[in-house]
Structures are given as structure tokens and as C-alpha cells.
Amino acid sequence: MKSVRILLALVLGLGMVQVAHAHRFAPSLLQVDEVAPQQYNMVWKTPAQGVSNVPLRPQWPQSCEVRSASEPQLEGTGVVTNWQLQCAGLGESGLVGQTLGVSGLGANQASVMVMVNLLDGRRYQQVLDTEHPDFVVPAQSTAGD
């Protein structure tokens, strides 16, 4: 009987390790790819479990219109959503000089990796957190050329 209890404790302990592996403090990812002038595919991946009822929500320029959006899909320990944006109101420079951000970072004690890939090959990466919840897309690449 004692060995059954020990075995049960080990199995439960391993189960808790698996639950802990789905870490709610893992950073989210916001990837923005320019696919045509003023057209962008946006991928948002965030942990399925949060620490708050306040959702994490990507933010983009108001002049960008959502052309299509996927339903959130469970993928591993995260939830993935895709959007296609049309940003004709931004002019020829597109997202350069524009602000991307995520709301809800403070309430969730979260961070987000933002990755922006433009048609001309410029690439940008920035970590957003409670102190820096926004990213202004610069004219010069920050990810090395």
C-alpha cells in the first residue's frame, strides 16, 4: 500500500511538471510581415493561460483596416490569431514612423517580442513590456543587415 502511495505521488508530481511547462509567463509574439505595398499579415501568439482577466491585445495604426481575421487557434501552449491589414491611409512609407503596441501588459506581467519585416528587406525586433508597451517602426533597420 505504501508503494502505491509513492507511485501515485510520483505520477501526480510529473503531471504538475507538465502543467508548469505551459508557462503563463512566456513572452507573446507579434509578427508583422509586409506582403505588398501597404498590406500586412499579422500573427499574434500568446500563452493560452494568463495571469489576469485583462486580455493582451495587439494595437496598430487606426488608419489600418482589418481585411480578414482568423479565429483564435490553440497551438501547443499558446493561442494564435492572424489578421490581414490594409494600411492605404499611411502613404508610401507604410508602417515606418507608425506605432505598434500591445495593451494589457501590466495587468498580465507580460512581455511581447515584436518582429516587423518590410518588403524592402528591412527587419525590426523589439521587446515590449510594462515600461515600453509601444514600438515606433524606425526608418533604419535594427536587426542587423
Language-model-derived ranges and their functions:
Residues 1-6:
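Positively charged n-region of N-terminal signal peptides that target proteins for export
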Residues 7-15:
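Bacterial N-terminal signal peptides
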Residues 17-19:
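N-terminal signal peptide c-region/cleavage motif recognized by signal peptidases
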Residues 21-145:
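Histidine-/acidic- and/or cysteine-rich, low-complexity loops and terminal segments associated
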